[in-house]
Regions:
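Substrate-binding cleft/loops of secretory-pathway carbohydrate-active enzymes
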Residues: 86-98, 109-141, 214-222
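Loop/helix patches that line or flank the sugar-binding groove of alpha-linked glycan CAZymes
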Residues: 161, 170, 175-345
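Active-site groove signature of glycoside hydrolases
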Residues: 61-86, 166
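Noncatalytic carbohydrate-binding groove/subsite architecture in carbohydrate-active enzymes
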Residues: 113-203
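Substrate-binding/active-site clefts of carbohydrate-active enzymes
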Residues: 1-67, 92
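The substrate-binding groove and active-site-proximal loops of carbohydrate-active enzymes
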Residues: 33-57, 73-83, 137-141, 174-183, ...
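Aromatic- and acidic-residue-enriched segments that line the glycan-binding/catalytic groove
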Residues: 1-29, 120-127, 215-232
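C-terminal beta-strand-rich structural cap/linker in extracellular carbohydrate-active enzymes
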Residues: 358-382
Length: 382
């Protein structure tokens, strides 16, 4: 108490967690290890905004962004960016990009109604495609949803699909191979091919995913929940094996780990090597294959990518059995993609190097065999 003061000083510190819990009793699921920064939004009085003069927090956060950008950081992944007012990003990101034009900003935004706001007003380069493509592919891989849902998923983005970041694992989500997801990393291969190859946008791989990391350790706080802990000091089995005591030669990996890694390596390499994936147009074939007599729209998904005289015919199979499918290629696909119609095309499966003959005609189905939990990327040049 200040000397001579009539009343003792009573302090009433702000009690706010990062997830907007405004009391002193957060529960175990609240972000009690975080604090809420003051970006100029009065959350306790209707969320009113006070952005003039520029909040001091904005200035400090811009300084932090510029500091790390000056150290050579090539991008920022902004956790739960939608919990920070879009006005801040609108103000800060252009200033960082003015000094560092090549830097990327990726936002974790889970509300589709806010996607365009954070892309076009907030100036983010990419947004997490979690509640759309990730959730859909996970449900399809687990048998809870039809593969036809993938079409509705990309259509719902209505033109911003190139600005979405695709992924199948991240620090928040359960591992594909865990008992809480697919229980087998091979079941994620069709989803990998779709997620990586259906558009020109980026694909994120979470460490250990390429080896089929189980995420089934019983860590301290995190517990056995199918995730790799972000709360405990821990190490990851497949990464330890890959490191091999600092040799980084992968010799401790199992043959199953190595096989899966080779698939991931091949698919991701194709994303950069194949111009049809990196720059080409996309055509979804599913609408022409509903209720197909030799095509299960619930277990298979098929589409095309094309650039100039190169065509990729991509088919994936989420089923546990090898399938012989007959795929209808509609006349509109030939017109839109400008594909010459031919009875016999020599095609190369870019995943295996195997060659096969296929027909591409609007009145005759294209016959292809696809293995269980697998896919084909057939390349045709004309």
């Amino acid at each position: 108490m200040k000397e001579g003061a009539a009343e003792p000083y009573h302090e009433y510190p702000a009690k706010a967690t990062g997830n907007n819990r405004f009391d002193a009793t957060p529960n175990i699921n609240d972000w009690y290890e975080t604090i809420k920064l003051n970006y100029g939004v009065d959350y306790l009085n209707g969320g009113t905004c006070h952005f003039s003069p520029t909040p001091d927090t904005w200035i400090k956060m811009l300084d932090i962004l510029l500091f790390w950008a000056s150290k050579g950081t090539d991008g920022f992944r902004c956790d739960m960016a939608e919990m920070v007012p879009v006005e801040f990003w609108e103000w800060a990101i252009p200033q960082v990009k003015e000094a560092h034009p090549e830097i990327l900003f990726i936002a974790e935004v889970y509300n589709p109604n806010e996607y365009r706001n954070y892309l076009f007003r907030g100036k983010f380069d990419y947004l997490y495609d979690k509640v759309g493509l990730y959730d859909t592919l996970r449900n399809v891989a687990c048998g809870y949803e039809s593969a036809a849902s993938i079409t509705h998923c990309w259509q719902s983005l209505n033109g911003i699909e190139k600005q979405m970041l695709n992924f199948l694992e991240n620090h928040d989500e359960q591992r594909i191979a865990s008992d809480f997801f697919a229980g087998d990393p091979r079941k994620g291969i069709p989803a990998l091919i779709v997620s990586a190859c259906m558009n020109t946008n980026p694909m994120m791989i979470y460490f250990g995913q390429e080896f089929g990391e189980l995420g089934m350790d019983s860590e301290g706080f995190s517990g056995r929940d199918g995730r790799t802990t972000i709360f405990d000091y821990w190490s990851v089995d497949t990464i330890r094996r890959w490191r091999n005591g600092g040799k980084f030669d992968g010799k401790m990996l199992t043959e199953e780990h190595k096989r899966l890694y080779s698939i991931y390596q091949r698919v991701l390499t194709l994303c950069n090597e194949e111009t049809s994936i990196a720059k080409g147009v996309f055509f979804d074939l599913m609408y022409a294959n509903k209720n197909g007599w030799r095509f299960d729209e619930h277990k298979q998904y098929t589409f095309m990518r094309k650039y100039k005289n190169e065509l990729l015919f991509i088919i994936v199979n989420f089923d546990s059995q090898l399938v012989d499918v007959a795929i209808n290629v509609p006349s509109h696909a030939f017109d839109f993609l400008q594909i010459p119609q031919m009875e016999k095309y020599q095609a190369t499966d870019l995943l295996t190097g195997a060659k096969e003959e296929i027909c591409l005609l609007p009145y005759k189905a294209t016959e292809v065999s696809v293995g269980a939990y697998n896919g084909k990327i057939l390349k045709i040049t004309f």
